[in-house]
Regions:
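Secretory targeting signals
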Residues: 1-6
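Short, glycine-/small- and polar/acidic-enriched structural segments
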Residues: 31-179, 183-187, 206
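Residues that mark the N-terminal boundary/hinge immediately upstream of a DNA-recognition element
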Residues: 7-8, 132
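Pocket-lining segment of extracytoplasmic ligand-binding domains
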Residues: 96, 172-176, 180-265
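Soluble non-cytosolic domains of exported or imported proteins
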Residues: 46, 77, 145, 149, ...
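Conserved C-terminal helix/tail region of periplasmic/extracytoplasmic solute-binding proteins
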Residues: 299-332
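N-terminal export signals
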Residues: 10-31
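Secondary-structure end/capping motifs
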Residues: 230-312
């Protein structure tokens, strides 16, 4: 799917919906009655969620009859509880987290997939690069011990002996790599590599998704009850998400600028946000989404996820993914 370029001025303005209403002589009170719902984000506000900010700023949810609150996540704000409780209509999660919750009885379904490619990478420096999984043998990798199953899955998928890799427990920072304490880092494509680039440090990344690590990320989850009883709200919410993320793709710099305009107290740096926003695009959009639309998946991509999740100790079936809301959004 393609989108027409959007000017920064339009992003930072009052929104197309409000402008259209004004042109028609309508007052805000004459617009469609609004249903208040919440979208629980998986982390703190940043350009990671800028497509949602665009949908809100442009009034696309308002057009659809929703008053959407964007709830920030964070280390002390897990996604799953508010979705289970019904205080959030939808949450932003990931297939592995959802699989874990379902194994404990949570009635979740995945409605859409924002990140088609998992953002986990192995970051390294050009003088001692990791270009493919086999290059990890004999190297020291800095990572959280909790992510050992992730590394083990990558090794299993690529025939690499994990015992040949030295795992060094580190905080989530580029400093151990820059100080020579490790040879590489397990991190996200959109954060520590960007931080190094902003410091003027050349670095490179090996995207684990390119080597079989298939775990859908930034997924939209809702409960089975919500799917059964609040479908119109789900369709309206996801319709806004689709429009917002297509607009984001058209101008990631404008999306980053909007992020800072909406959340000026979040301590965000504009240039960093611009780089992060741009690096996110290849993770979210592909030939698959160009053919079918933002958030889509296929039986093949689900099968690949099930295989990787099994290596992570999570047994799931294809019915964890429910495409019926997206099918309504796209009229499929």
């Amino acid at each position: 799917m393609t989108s027409m370029p959007l000017s920064r001025r339009r992003f930072l303005g009052t929104g197309a919906a409000a402008a259209g209403a004004t042109a028609l002589g309508l007052k805000p009170s004459q617009l469609r009655a609004q249903t208040a719902v919440s979208l629980q984000l998986s982390w703190l506000h940043s350009s990671q969620f800028a497509g949602s900010y665009i949908a809100q700023d442009r009034g696309w949810w308002t057009e659809a009859g929703l008053d959407v609150s964007l709830l920030p996540g964070g280390p002390n704000a897990p996604v799953e509880p508010p979705v289970v409780a019904g205080t959030a209509l939808v949450g932003i999660s990931a297939a592995d987290y959802t699989a874990a919750a379902v194994s404990e009885g949570a009635p979740f379904k995945i409605l859409g997939v924002a990140m088609q490619k998992n953002p986990f990478v192995v970051a390294s420096l050009p003088a001692n690069p990791v270009n493919e999984p086999a290059d990890l043998v004999g190297k020291r990798i800095g990572m959280a011990l909790a992510n050992t199953p992730v590394l083990q899955a990558l090794c299993s998928l690529n025939g690499v002996d994990i015992n040949g890799i030295e795992i060094v427990p580190t905080q989530y920072s580029a400093q151990p790599l820059l100080a020579g304490e490790v040879d590489c880092l397990l991190c996200w494509e959109t954060d520590l590599p960007v931080a190094m680039t902003m410091q003027g440090v050349d670095n490179q990344t090996m995207l684990m998704a390119d080597y079989g690590y298939s775990v859908h990320s930034q997924t939209y989850i809702a409960t089975e009850d919500t799917l059964a009883n609040r479908r119109s709200e789900l369709v309206a919410l996801m319709s806004g998400e689709v429009r917002g993320w297509d607009a984001y793709r058209a101008d990631t710099d404008a999306a980053a600028e909007l992020t800072l305009a909406m959340y000026p107290d979040a301590g965000l740096d504009l240039e960093t946000q611009k780089r992060q926003a741009a690096r996110q695009v290849p993770l979210m959009f592909s030939d698959l989404t160009d053919a079918n639309g933002f958030g889509w998946w296929t039986d093949d991509t689900v099968a690949a996820n099930i295989e990787t999740l099994a290596l992570l100790g999570r047994t799931v079936t294809p019915d964890l993914w429910d495409r019926s809301i997206l099918e309504e959004v796209y009229g499929a």
